[in-house]
Amino acid sequence: MITGRTALYGVVGHPVAHSRSPEMQNAAFAKLGVDAAYVALPVAPERIDEALRGAHALGFQGLNVTVPHKPRAASLCHALDPVATAVGAANTLRRTRDGWEGFNTDAPACRTLLEAAGVARGARALLVGAGGAARAAAWALLQLGTELRVAARREEAAAELCRDLAAAVPGADAATADFEDLEAEADAAAVVVNGTSVELPGHEGRLPPLRFRADQVVLDFVYGDTELARAARAGGARLVTGEQVLVRQGALAFTIWTGLPAPEADMARALEAREGAR
């Protein structure tokens, strides 16, 4: 039951109705008996500045930030953790007296999951996209010592990502790749990461059909039965799903907000229950 003492949290994005974070985080609060509620907050890109000020004024204790607001959210925080600083994007905000403190939990979540999938130092990695999620994945891949190649529809955005992350990660090997020849770039890579928002509700465009092999690792930030996930399974690749990324980053965010170990298994079950109800 929501009362006058219930702590408020939410996720801001555009669009955001598809987000599974409310089910996941509310399940975590319920499991641990935390008096809190988490809601989805649709915010158009041109209103993100006033939305974050308003959420702070309304007493929200923490926020998640999703497409397309992560880079802008980082610039609006009065303090950033080292990973958010390096990545240039924040997906988790914690309330302070002076405003918002920004964190990036996407990046360590990706690193943990990619490492568990067997990504090896020196492996060639193809990252598709150059937005906030892609920046987090780039940090993770460079931390793992991969040879990173970034392909984006806007080549200048891919080049900027490479420059920023190379400066932030000592010894980084990062360069752009040819988006127009994505099939060949993916075939040459041991690791392929989709950091774009294609196949999200409200987002147009598709990646070209890609084929994968059993010796490849594929990570898709978009959750659900995506074309990329189906292709990875068909080829026998080791697949890291968007759901896995969502749960891991969400668990890290939960701990940042509450100081409590996140009930990660319960959070994952909440996602599965929603998927089963669709």
From Swiss-Prot:
It catalyses: shikimate + NADP(+) = 3-dehydroshikimate + NADPH + H(+). NADP(+) binds at G129, A130, G131, G132, A133, F221, G242. The keyword Amino-acid biosynthesis applies. The active site is at K70 (proton acceptor). It is an enzyme of class 1 (oxidoreductase). It comes from the Bacteria. HAMAP family: Shikimate_DH_AroE. Homodimer. Involved in the biosynthesis of the chorismate, which leads to the biosynthesis of aromatic amino acids. Catalyzes the reversible NADPH linked reduction of 3-dehydroshikimate (DHSA) to yield shikimate (SA). This is Shikimate dehydrogenase (NADP(+)). The lineage of its organism: Bacteria, Pseudomonadati, Myxococcota, Myxococcia, Myxococcales.
